[in-house]
């Protein structure tokens, strides 16, 4: 992610799911402080390994940022202070589409019930809202699935979870998927002959400023 495409200045702090560490590496290259949290210990170890490199930037003012990683649950970010984060970037599992950590307790990729998954994502949304500074953004990439040869909309349920937490929807960016060689749809699509889901939603939410009059954003907020 080029510097001109990020809303974080070097002193700002970013929070994200550690995953394979790609985003944390970009934060290091850009000089952005970051915290990576993941429920999977293997993912945290991979992220730490990928962060272990020397970097000599062209920018003379570059300073090596503080980047922390730890094993944790997005539903309980107890090591992160309230209103201390400038940007959240996360790519949660899509219910039980692809197992993430092999039956680790608390892993949402093991939750088969879509209703239960949406309920747990509401807890994630509330924690994201708590740790994010007022006026700052939370970006979340989410996709849908198909069961019994029918489309199952996960994204609108998760969208409603974040609006329920108090967020304002700033953007809905459609991410097209190309050459899907490792998704569940690719595994079963040819056998059962159905249309591949070729996109994901990148939702960008904004936390209102303290005392902000949000009535003008009512169409972009919780409406039910």
Walk through the language-model features, giving the residues of each.
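Class I S-adenosyl-L-methionine-dependent methyltransferase catalytic core
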Residues: 1-224
């Amino acid at each position: 992610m080029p510097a001109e495409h990020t809303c974080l200045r070097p002193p700002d702090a970013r929070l994200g799911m550690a995953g394979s560490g790609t985003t944390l590496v970009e934060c290091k290259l850009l000089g952005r402080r970051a915290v990576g949290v993941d429920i999977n210990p293997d993912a945290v170890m991979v992220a730490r390994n990928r962060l272990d490199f020397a970097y000599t930037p062209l920018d003379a003012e570059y300073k090596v940022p503080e980047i922390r990683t730890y094993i944790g649950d997005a539903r309980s970010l107890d090591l992160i202070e309230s209103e201390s984060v400038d940007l959240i970037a996360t790519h949660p599992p899509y219910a039980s589409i692809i197992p993430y950590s092999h039956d680790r307790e608390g892993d949402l990729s093991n939750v088969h019930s879509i209703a239960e998954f949406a309920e747990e994502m509401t807890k994630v949304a509330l924690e994201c809202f708590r740790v994010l500074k007022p006026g700052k953004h939370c970006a979340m990439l989410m996709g849908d699935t198909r069961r019994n040869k029918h489309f199952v909309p996960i994204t609108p349920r998760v969208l409603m979870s974040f609006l329920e937490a108090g967020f304002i929807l700033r953007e809905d960016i459609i991410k097209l998927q190309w050459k899907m060689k490792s998704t569940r749809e690719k595994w079963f699509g040819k056998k059962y002959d159905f249309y591949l889901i070729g996109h994901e939603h990148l939702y960008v939410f904004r936390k209102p400023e303290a005392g902000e009059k949000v009535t003008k954003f009512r169409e972009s907020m919780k409406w039910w």
